[in-house]
Amino acid sequence: MPIVPEILREVALTEEEYARAVALLGREPNLIELGMIGALWSEHCGYKHSRPLLRKLPTSGPHVVQGPGENAGAVELGDGLVVVLKIESHNHPSAVEPFQGAATGVGGIVRDIFAMGARPIALADSLRFGPLEEPRQQYLFHGVVGGIGWYGNCLGIPTVAGDVFFAPEYRQNPLVNAMCVGIAERSALIRARATGPGNLVVLVGADTGRDGIHGATFASVEDPERSHRGVVQVGNPFLEKLLLEACLEVLETGAVVAMQDLGAAGLTSASAEIAARGGTGIELDVALVPRRETGMTPYEVMLSESQERMLLVVDPEGIDRVLAIFRRWELHAVVIGRVTDDGLLRVLEDGQVVAELPVWLLTDACPTYVREAREAGEIRERRAFDPDALPDLQPAEVAEMLAALLRSPNIASRRPIYRTYDHTILTNTVLPPGAADAAVLRIKGQRFGIALKTDCNPRYCLLDPRLGTMHAVAEAARNVSCVGAEPLAITDCLNFGNPERPEIYYQLVQAIEGMAEACTVLGIPVVSGNVSLYNETEGRSIPPTPVVGIVGRLADVRRCVGMGFRGEGKVFLLGSELATLGGSEFLAQRHGLVAGAPPPLDLELERRVQACVREGIARGIVLAAHDCSEGGLLIALAESCMVGRIGGRFTTESLIAANGRLDRALFGESASRVIVQVAEGAEGALLGLARAHGVPVQELGRTGGDRFVVGELVDQPLSELIELWTTGLVESA
């Protein structure tokens, strides 16, 4: 049939890309082949705009076992164990059907982890919504949170960390980024590489339906006109639990050569990717694929994104053992093809060839684009705004401002979110959500443990995408350092608008360059990740949102500390005393502005502050640690008091004098700042430690009592602050 523009739009190929495919193939592709090319050449699968840029990121390091290019990254922990980590987006499906979109996002990221041979032990999520007082945003919020909790809870995997942010720019395009970590024996890791011609290709899991067809291309274009409910998959966490356990068991047979999740572009992507990595070809017969719907065409079978499916390459000598294990788990597993040595992805239907493409054409020949990059003038104007031109906060207004910030959705307690998640199942959670700047998990049978967190301040990234992304890396690392963990590796999820627009491509370029610089200076490799572009509707884009997921290692999990103050003791500030109002939560709440330059970031000072905090925790000097981020110093102090359920008396005169303004000193934001509570009698040790690391330090006050007192500015019962903080999100939703 002739290829007309309507068909090209359906598969998200431009006329130029179609001409490229014809030239490379030496003939016109048929409709099935065209759909396969469109899916694998989509932004979602082919990374057309980001692939050249991602090469700038540091991906190697002394602990890295597996970097980008596999289902997930892996980092050495010690004693023969590795931690496997990955983050991915499910933004577009969640905007259409929030519950199932978020739920299947969790399912997909979990499959990426056990596809490596690792047992998933924890989840984290990074979420973005519009203003929560709006009914549609409440619908999205409750749907997404409910979907994450439902799928994770049913799977028996705790959701222990994450972050959430609310801003008008996310009204039409919410973001749902899901992260999973797993633990494996290094020797048991398996790669998704289809080696060994003659080995068998096995499809296991759910029967294939029509759900999710064109899901990859849907996530690669801006198309607000169409209803896309049909491309949102429906998840079955109970089936995934069986799949997880069965896949880990069949790996023990030694007969499994490769394993791959069926995610975006379904069977097409999974088979092409494992063949490409293995330097082989694959022949499949779609007539052998179990289906739950009648009349499905080869096109639909190859592009279906039905959930809870895995593709395995199995040695023929072990196939009976593998299939027997799957039967015992009551899973439908069938041999649908074999590995070949001709480098082709050949699709049969009842033995007749219906599509045949070179694997390299699908995976390596996807065009890449370098676009014009130009910063939007409106953003330059916003960044040039000087917050000092605004009237300063008056002393009598400080307590009221503190209350307003504590109940604002971007600062209020996240308990209404994480209470819907089972965060203690598996009995590994040492520091749960809300107790610390990062979650801490033990590894059974080991003294060491891991910490994990996600971070990104989109206001900073909007105003300065390079600096804002550097802040995201620094804050994520600071968060795991504040529990005593050494940052090991990062997995990133780059959420942006339409890269064909110069101002959006500029944001993407700047963000990746900023991430590369921060990771290089801090010595943290990027081992996996995901790119989600075209997050915009009718030309209105989301702010650049490069989410950083991080994993850290604690040498002794028993020595971790939380953010809550523990009993009476002195409190100190480590890091710079200077702050800024640019891009701050205060500026948005008080003046309704997202403007000014984000705080400067000295990466060398950041590195020293984090090392100082980690050593202080390891030596037992530091009893509690909390980084100063959104809301500034006063919010950080209040949060540590509220979490620890103890009051305190603090003084800020020197900070006010140094900053020259009351609002900047109390609610201004800055990088490289951590408040710490010190063990009785250990004040001198902290001062000596700070000097040794070259870190500024000053005393802020002392904990005790049941009131929160800041000089002559604030004197309130802690219980009142707790009430404001813990109900803020509930009242908004």
From Swiss-Prot:
GO terms for cellular component: cytoplasm. SUPFAM superfamilies: PurM C-terminal domain-like, PurM N-terminal domain-like. It comes from the Bacteria. Mg(2+) 2 binds at residues 112, 261. Pathway: Purine metabolism; IMP biosynthesis via de novo pathway; 5-amino-1-(5-phospho-D-ribosyl)imidazole from N(2)-formyl-N(1)-(5-phospho-D-ribosyl)glycinamide: step 1/2. Keywords: ATP-binding, Cytoplasm, Ligase, Magnesium, Metal-binding, Nucleotide-binding, Purine biosynthesis. Its EC number is 6.3.5.3. The active site is at 44, 90 (proton acceptor). It is found in: Cytoplasm. Mg(2+) 1 binds at residues 88, 530. ATP binds at residues 47, 86, 492, 529. Pfam families: AIRS, AIRS_C, FGAR-AT_linker. It catalyses: N(2)-formyl-N(1)-(5-phospho-beta-D-ribosyl)glycinamide + L-glutamine + ATP + H2O = 2-formamido-N(1)-(5-O-phospho-beta-D-ribosyl)acetamidine + L-glutamate + ADP + phosphate + H(+). Substrate binds at residues 89-92, 111, 233, 305-307, 532. Part of the phosphoribosylformylglycinamidine synthase complex involved in the purines biosynthetic pathway. Catalyzes the ATP-dependent conversion of formylglycinamide ribonucleotide (FGAR) and glutamine to yield formylglycinamidine ribonucleotide (FGAM) and glutamate. The FGAM synthase complex is composed of three subunits. PurQ produces an ammonia molecule by converting glutamine to glutamate. PurL transfers the ammonia molecule to FGAR to form FGAM in an ATP-dependent manner. Monomer. Part of the FGAM synthase complex composed of 1 PurL, 1 PurQ and 2 PurS subunits. Belongs to the FGAMS family. This is Phosphoribosylformylglycinamidine synthase subunit PurL. It comes from Thermomicrobium roseum (strain ATCC 27502 / DSM 5159 / P-2). The lineage of its organism: Bacteria, Pseudomonadati, Thermomicrobiota, Thermomicrobia, Thermomicrobiales. The gene is purL.
